[in-house]
């Protein structure tokens, strides 16, 4: 009975400390990681704007003040023998020391390198960078369903940006408000956006249809919500990746939706198991069966890991629980925190590698259990050698044999070769527009690392809707000259000219063509009341014409070979703007 009571107390304490650990993790995630930098940014803004001190003065003062408070706290904790306070302060201190590595981001950005994403050169921009503001906000514990319609908006804060006279206000932060009946606890189906078909993915996954007007024929229930959590977020977006590493992989074709039995699934290599889950695998075409990433591990790493897990809990329950926490918080907890919407653009297995490491610990401990079993059969002397040999052949050797060919990146050079071909095909001092990460990063690598065609200016059109990226075009990069953006940094700051609607103006008859430069600089770029639309509650710049022209320098196009000497050359290029609303990235291209 005494032993049983000790066990109850032991496991009861484990559960309590697990909950405490979850709370501490939340405090660290929000309080330390986010609000320490937010407070430092607020101090810097006050010191710069309110006291006319240099940038970083308030930022530096905040952390000096914090260090002094920690020192006093440690001193008091030592005098009062408050051990938990001392431990907490030391933990907090070391977290800040580790967190301080993000200072290198500001140091690098302040040097204005040619590749300077987000331009994090001051404390206020660091706040947005670390807060992942560019990715938007999403609910975790309570929030809207994907079928909900916003009822109102609420101002949540002010956005600031470094300018020549201090930190200037560039707009407000808002969040949508929803009615309580359109919210749910622990929302997993929350994203109403269909830019990447997120909402439609939810609907298809849950069997929700559409009405003729495009609305959904019912709202998701809490059962639907949990079904999506387990069916998609945990099973498809975590467990599938987990089993790739420890059971086997069908092929390297991206799995874009659950129910696709052909692409990107996990397998075992054991026919009757795989056939039950994915259909008759022998009927797959040779292009998939002979895919280098068709890896059969026979679930041996997974089985050995389970053996090690049970062995660990049997021998050292406390240590096993620590490793379980690492496994949980770098796996399932990340699934819950990320709250990924459906139809992800790429596989996300890299996000959970920490939990794979934790499971690998149990694979190693599984060898000890195999050793104990073999000792009963073959004897204690030979058991360690035999267990090591058997496990080495059963797990690492098979993994090498099955996976080395598709994990060897030494000959996968298509991204680099395409980037080189793109750059080499351009005329001298050309401007090369790209779209998205996959198009752009190989080009940057080719230019920055291998020095291929540094005279070409690579412009990522996906980033042209952001002021800091447009401003970077004003400067010479490598051997490519600066670009005249027409508008000043003040004219595109923050949310200024984020979008510009078309509004006809009687002064501009719609049967004529107008010089694009003149329209952009002297109409769209001017804040005169008569040029602006006030119907939306605040003045918004407009563009008055859809027929525009660009003058052609005949001598230049003949000299550079764009046209032949025998060709006739137009005096101007004419085109029509088909859109009724131009966003900042559209305007940047036109400029």
What are the residue ranges of the model-derived segments?
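ER/secretory pathway lumenal C-terminal domains and tails of membrane proteins involved
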Residues: 1-352, 359-429, 444-591
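Residues that form or flank phosphate/diphosphate-binding pockets in enzymes
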Residues: 441
């Amino acid at each position: 009975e005494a032993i049983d009571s000790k066990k109850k107390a032991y496991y009861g304490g484990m559960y309590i400390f697990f909950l405490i650990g979850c709370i501490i993790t939340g405090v660290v995630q929000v309080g330390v990681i986010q609000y320490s930098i937010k407070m430092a940014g607020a101090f810097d803004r006050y010191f710069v704007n309110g006291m006319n001190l240099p940038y970083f003065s308030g930022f530096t003062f905040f952390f000096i003040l914090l260090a002094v408070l920690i020192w006093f706290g440690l001193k008091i904790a030592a005098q009062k023998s408050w051990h938990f306070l001392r431990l907490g302060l030391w933990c907090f201190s070391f977290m800040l020391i580790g967190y301080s590595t993000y200072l290198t981001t500001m140091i690098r950005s302040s040097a204005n390198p040619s590749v300077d994403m987000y331009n994090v050169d001051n404390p206020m921009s660091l706040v947005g960078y670390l807060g992942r503001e560019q990715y938007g906000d999403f609910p975790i514990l309570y929030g809207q369903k994907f079928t909900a319609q916003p009822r109102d908006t609420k101002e949540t804060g002010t956005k600031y940006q470094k300018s020549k006279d201090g930190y200037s206000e560039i707009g407000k932060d808002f969040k949508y408000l929803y009615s309580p009946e359109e919210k749910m606890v622990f929302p997993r189906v929350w994203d109403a956006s269909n830019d990447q078909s997120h909402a439609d993915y939810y609907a298809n996954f849950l069997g929700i249809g559409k009405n003729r007007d495009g609305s959904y024929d019912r709202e998701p229930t809490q059962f639907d919500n949990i079904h999506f959590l387990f069916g998609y977020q945990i099973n498809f977006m975590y467990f599938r990746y987990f089993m790739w590493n420890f059971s086997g992989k069908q092929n390297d074709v991206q799995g874009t939706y659950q129910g696709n039995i052909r692409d990107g699934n996990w397998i075992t290599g054991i026919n009757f198991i795989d056939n039950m889950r994915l259909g008759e695998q022998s009927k797959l075409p040779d292009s998939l069966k002979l895919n280098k990433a068709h890896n059969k591990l026979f679930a041996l790493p997974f089985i050995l890991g389970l053996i090690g897990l049970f062995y660990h809990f049997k021998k050292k329950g406390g240590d096993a629980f620590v490793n379980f926490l690492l496994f949980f918080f770098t796996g399932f907890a990340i699934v819950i925190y990320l709250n990924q919407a459906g139809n992800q653009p790429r596989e996300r297995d890299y996000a959970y590698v920490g939990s794979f490491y934790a499971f690998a610990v149990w694979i190693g401990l599984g060898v000890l259990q195999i050793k104990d079993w073999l000792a009963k059969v073959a004897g204690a002397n030979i058991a360690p050698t035999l267990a090591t040999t058997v496990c080495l052949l059963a797990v690492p050797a098979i993994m090498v044999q099955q996976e080395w060919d598709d994990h060897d990146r030494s000959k996968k050079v298509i991204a680099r070769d395409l980037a080189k071909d793109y750059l080499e095909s351009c005329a001298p001092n050309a401007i090369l527009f790209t779209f998205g990460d996959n198009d752009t990063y190989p080009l940057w690598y080719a230019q920055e690392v291998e020095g291929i065609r540094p005279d070409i200016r690579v412009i990522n059109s996906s980033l042209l809707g952001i002021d800091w990226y447009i401003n970077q075009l004003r400067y010479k990069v490598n051997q490519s000259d600066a670009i005249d953006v027409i508008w000043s940094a003040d004219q595109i700051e923050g949310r200024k000219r984020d979008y510009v609607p078309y509004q006809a103006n009687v002064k501009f008859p719609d049967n004529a063509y107008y010089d694009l430069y003149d329209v952009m600089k002297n109409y769209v770029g001017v804040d005169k009341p008569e040029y602006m639309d006030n119907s939306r509650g605040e003045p918004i710049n407009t563009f008055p014409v859809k027929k525009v022209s660009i003058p052609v320098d005949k001598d230049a196009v003949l000299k550079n070979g764009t046209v032949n000497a025998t060709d006739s050359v137009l005096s101007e290029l004419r085109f029509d703007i088909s859109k009724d609303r131009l966003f900042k990235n559209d305007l940047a291209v036109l400029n």
